[in-house]
UniProtKB/Swiss-Prot annotation:
<dbReference type="GO" id="GO:0050295">
    <property type="term" value="F:steryl-beta-glucosidase activity"/>
</dbReference>
<dbReference type="GO" id="GO:0046527">
    <property type="term" value="F:glucosyltransferase activity"/>
</dbReference>
<dbReference type="GO" id="GO:0005765">
    <property type="term" value="C:lysosomal membrane"/>
</dbReference>
<keyword id="KW-0378">Hydrolase</keyword>
<keyword id="KW-0458">Lysosome</keyword>
<dbReference type="GO" id="GO:0032006">
    <property type="term" value="P:regulation of TOR signaling"/>
</dbReference>
<keyword id="KW-0808">Transferase</keyword>
<dbReference type="InterPro" id="IPR017853">
    <property type="entry name" value="Glycoside_hydrolase_SF"/>
</dbReference>
<feature type="glycosylation site" description="N-linked (GlcNAc...) asparagine">
    <location>
        <position position="501"/>
    </location>
</feature>
<keyword id="KW-0153">Cholesterol metabolism</keyword>
<comment type="function">
    <text>Glucosylceramidase that catalyzes, within the lysosomal compartment, the hydrolysis of glucosylceramides/GlcCers (such as beta-D-glucosyl-(1&lt;-&gt;1')-N-acylsphing-4-enine) into free ceramides (such as N-acylsphing-4-enine) and glucose. Plays a central role in the degradation of complex lipids and the turnover of cellular membranes. Through the production of ceramides, participates in the PKC-activated salvage pathway of ceramide formation. Catalyzes the glucosylation of cholesterol, through a transglucosylation reaction where glucose is transferred from GlcCer to cholesterol.</text>
</comment>
<feature type="active site" description="Proton donor">
    <location>
        <position position="274"/>
    </location>
</feature>
<feature type="glycosylation site" description="N-linked (GlcNAc...) asparagine">
    <location>
        <position position="185"/>
    </location>
</feature>
<keyword id="KW-0326">Glycosidase</keyword>
<dbReference type="GO" id="GO:0008203">
    <property type="term" value="P:cholesterol metabolic process"/>
</dbReference>
<feature type="disulfide bond">
    <location>
        <begin position="57"/>
        <end position="62"/>
    </location>
</feature>
<feature type="glycosylation site" description="N-linked (GlcNAc...) asparagine">
    <location>
        <position position="58"/>
    </location>
</feature>
Amino acid sequence: MELSSPSREECPRPQGRVGIMAASLMGLLLLQAASWASGARPCSPKSFGYSSVVCVCNATYCDSLDPLTLPDPGTFSRFESTRSGRRMELSLGTFQANRTSKGLLLTLQPDQKFQKVKGFGGAMTDAAALNILALSPQARNLLLKSYFSEEGIEYNIIRVPMASCDFSIRIYTYADTPDDFQLLNFSLPEEDVKLKIPLIHQALKMAQRPVSLFASPWTSPTWLKTNGAVNGKGTLKGHPGDRYHQTWAKYFVKFLDAYAEHNLHFWAVTAENEPSAGLFTGYPFQCLGFTPEHQRDFIARDPGPTLANSTHRNVRLLMLDDQRLLLPHWAQVVLADPEAAKYVHGIAVHWYLDFLAPAKATLGETHRLFPNTMLFASEACVGSKFWEQSVRLGSWDRGVQYSHSIITNLLYHVVGWTDWNLALNPEGGPNWVRNFVDSPIIVDISKDTFYKQPMFYHLGHFSKFIPEGSQRVGLAASEKNNLDTVALLRPDGSAVVVVLNRSSKDVPLTIKDPALGFLETISPSYSIHTYLWHRK
């Protein structure tokens, strides 16, 4: 990446020892300033011919950030990523008492309060774990630090598949012995014990913030299913409350027990990953079908009371875990029944059909109907559609898709946003049905190298700066504009504003904080910025 400098006058050569010392000191200060301005270690860029670059990491080098500190009162920090190659680069500025520029004005409205944030993260699938563990210990450590440490983007959510999914290299459940209704042969295989669990522990040790785990099942054991297969059209045999449904509910408790024995405890479970998938003939990978009515009765009679009467009564239960296109209908069916509703903490949504389902008509309407049931984005990835290339190393647009989705979700009351695989190989796998997709980190095992994509940094513009407990507040625009913007107040009282410019035009703008004054800035074309300042 070439860095251009502004034109400048030549400085006269310093004379004598004092001059040399002054020049040396100035050089050191400039170097230090450059280090401060670009994080602890800058991106090592590489282009693969797409719209932007990846940052290359290996056993000896990886770009990193400084631990986050609040700027001095009356000043702000600005973190910038651009299509041209900047990656979360820090600069500082000062609030002004008066506004001097024209154009767009964004006014912080701290008294207009909305949802509190749970957090941001990704999924520790079998595929992700296999790729991460294939790296040398040094490179692996840097990858996990990039996601979870203060030097990285500080994820605080990890999704854990319950047994196999498409991003596994074999098909298995935790209870494959037929007719084992007491689940006496339930056990965690090597995928959990040797892959996922050690990596999750390593991530938790690195994190300065508490990390919340949530789990989702793809399929039950085949002997509990109507079609006797992990995939295709099939549901649980029988009806809610019977031994098939009760056994499946007990399976959740057994899973939580097994992970607790490894000292891992869960914040939440989802009732089923994409329950609509198992209603389709020929569905290619692990699934278990539920209609909304079936899920309603299942929650009310099986996992709801089973979890409530177990040692895991504090584990939250999330319904849906499927496309938001199914809202508000699914919520209306499930939550209309008080017996089901009392067990449901939240509604999990996936992003894959968002282009068919406007946020206002789905998320907005669901929040209007059920304001006390939280909305949570539980899965997203790019490259899954049949017309999309699986992996596009360095694609800026794919990062933009992430940040645009996160801002839209935040504006419509969603409390968290979860990416899919934490890491994949250059093909977008492994995946046993070859359902290859993209990931914010791509691992090239042959070179003991991993690539941090624009998606990684777009996510980081939220995850690093918006800790759990932050609350979205109002941000009023003086005129119609093409920027995506959102504002939040952190638990420490500081303010965060994220500005995404998806357009080809630079946009001059001013952010007004009624308590401090005016922050005058520019949102360059194809850029994302996070602004942070102290309000107390």
